[in-house]
Amino acid sequence: MEQIYDMIVIGGGPAGYTAALYAARSGLSVLVLEKLSAGGQMALTEQIDNYPGFEDGIDGFTLGEKMQQSAERFGAVTELAEVYKASLSGRIKTLETSEGVFQGRTVVIATGASPRPLGVPGEEALVGKGVHYCAACDGAPYRGRTVAVVGGGNSAAADALTLSRIAKKVYLIHRRDSLRATKVYHAPLMAAPNVEFCWNSTVSALLHESRLTGLRLKGVNTGAEHDLSCDSVFISVGRAPATELFRSELALDKSGYIIADESTRTSITGVFAVGDVRTKALRQVVTAVSDGAVAVHYAEEYLAENR
């Protein structure tokens, strides 16, 4: 008879492996399904300085490996597999993957959300080499330097404000002639002496040698192009949660995030959503880790009532 796990975690990022650690340490049988490698999006971050315990910071890949090892130390099992189909409504949850079918009494969804790329040639190769998607995560090394932010919504405005406090110069590039961000951001950005707006502009090329050296901007109305020198660009044009698998069963918000409050419980009992994939105000490594621990607390309550 195939094993039925107490908990199956989908996704091996910080939220997923924290859930696995807490559950395994509590004596639950735990399987983590990860399609690539430990760390999730965090693994792409060159330097993490805002996660406690590392006085010199740590790279995301190494931190992801450490989280995996911590969970496996207490008996959690990792399977490198991609989930193709999820049946979550029953008392026993069934997941069909590239490596076979797995069953669990509870499921923790930690599939994350990916930044939407600009789609400019060379973008992927320059990630971590001047191309970034999170100012709070990756902005610190650019203190006193020239940076650019692409986008016009709340996240772009917040990134530009964050960077304006440390960078020598911040270019905010937006394809329209005004910000879509809420009004609370407008006055501080307009008042910042080191923020320059590039309205009605898109990025047509990334200039680089071994690292990013600048951007080629194209006028939306004129089609004219010009080059802009900068040490980094922070792309903030939205995020895409990895929730397509769950659309037919779970309640999602209009942006595709799984609706779950601070308990991490979803619209299906025994199913929890943690980290960047759920509705929440702040998406950071520390908040993802918190979600993982909280999910196990409520999963244990559920298991005690449904054995």
Region annotations inferred by a language model:
Residues 71-90, 95-96, 101-102, 164-262, ...:
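A Rossmann-like FAD-binding core segment of flavoenzymes
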Residues 5-74, 157-183, 253:
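Beta1-alpha1 glycine-rich phosphate/pyrophosphate-binding loop at the start
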Residues 4-6, 80-81, 143-145, 200, ...:
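Phosphate-coordination loops involved in phosphoryl transfer and adenosine-cofactor binding
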